[in-house]
Amino acid sequence: MSCCGGNCGCGSSCKCGSGCGGCKMYPDMSYTEQTTSETLVMGVASGKTQFEGAEMGFGAENDGCKCGSNCTCNPCTCK
């Protein structure tokens, strides 16, 4: 897995940068634990679902850099 030259940011739009301090290639050294919380919202909705192609432009919009677990790129093909 590529780490974008060691700089895989998980900031806005998941763009490559130094937002997460690199890819944490050596977790035992300078390891910082991050805690996140998730909220699950459940409800009732109509049976009709519409997709307007929003998911189509995600990869191109972010130059192929997607955030995986622990702020690593998965996959990362950004330049």
Swiss-Prot record:
Pfam families assigned: Metallothio_2 (PF01439)
Alphabetical keyword list: Metal-binding, Metal-thiolate cluster
GO molecular function: metal ion binding
Signal peptide: none
Taxonomy, superkingdom: Eukaryota
Role this protein plays: Metallothioneins have a high content of cysteine residues that bind various heavy metals.
Family as reported in the entry's similarity comment: Belongs to the metallothionein superfamily. Type 15 family.
Name of the protein in question: Metallothionein-like protein 2
Organism: Cicer arietinum (Chickpea)
